């Protein structure tokens, strides 16, 4: 199992959707929130995703399909 750290950026209605819940329920990934900041109009979360690389890619593609910005980060 590999770990991928990402920053997800939310705008508008997307910040009210249960995206992190959906990732854990619909994809074979384990999520861990490292940091987050959510305001009235925008928000972001740094998130670890543990899982097989193909499943992590599927989860991130789901985020992109919801107009959520996805940036892969280097491990600290």
Regions found by a protein language model. Give the residues of each.
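Long, contiguous binding/interaction regions
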Residues: 1-76
């Amino acid at each position: 199992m590999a770990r991928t750290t990402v920053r997800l950026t939310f705008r508008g209605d997307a910040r009210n959707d249960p995206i992190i819940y959906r990732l854990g329920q619909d994809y074979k990934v384990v999520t861990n929130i490292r940091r987050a900041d959510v305001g009235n109009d925008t928000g972001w979360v740094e998130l670890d995703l543990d899982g097989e690389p193909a499943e992590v890619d599927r989860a991130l593609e789901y985020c992109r399909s919801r107009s959520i910005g996805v940036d892969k980060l280097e491990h600290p």
